[in-house]
C-alpha cells in the first residue's frame, strides 16, 4: 500500500488547527494550499537574499513539556548564513547565559524562526529543527561576522521543514537608523547644492 506523505503545511495545520479553520469557515482556502503540496520546503534564491539582508531574527523553542520560549538574535547583514536550500546557520553570541534555548534544544529539537522586514513590511515564518554545535571552531569562525564586536559561544544550525510568507497587514513601517541617516544626508547635500546655485545666480544678477 502506497502511503501519501502529508502536506508540508501540516507542520502548522494540526488537527486542532484544522478544526478551528472549519469552525471559522476558512477550511476550503487552506485545503487548497494542502492540495498544492502545502508550504514551500526549500530556500529559494529570493528567500536566501531576504535572509542575508536581515539584522534580526526571533528563534522559538520549547521544552520537552511544551513550555515555549522565544529569543531574539541579531547581528550585521549577513550574520544569518544560508548553507544550502534546507539549512540556515549563525554564530550564537554570548548573552545573558540563562541557556534556555540550548536547554530546550537538548531535549526538543523542534524550532521556529520568525523574520520581519519592517521597511518593506514583509515577514517570513520558518518551521524546522535546530541543533547546537559547540565543538567546531572552524564552523563557528566561518559564521562569525567580520569585525563584529561579539564573542561566539557556539553555532546554531537550523534545518528547514517548511516556510511561509505573511501578508503585510498590520506591520508598522520602520526604517534602520543607518538608512534614515543616509537618506537625510542625501537631502542635506541636495539642499546645499541648491542653495549654492541660488547664491551663484544672485551674484550673477547683481
Regions found by a protein language model. Give the residues of each.
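Binding-site signature for planar aromatic cofactors or substrates
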Residues: 1-206
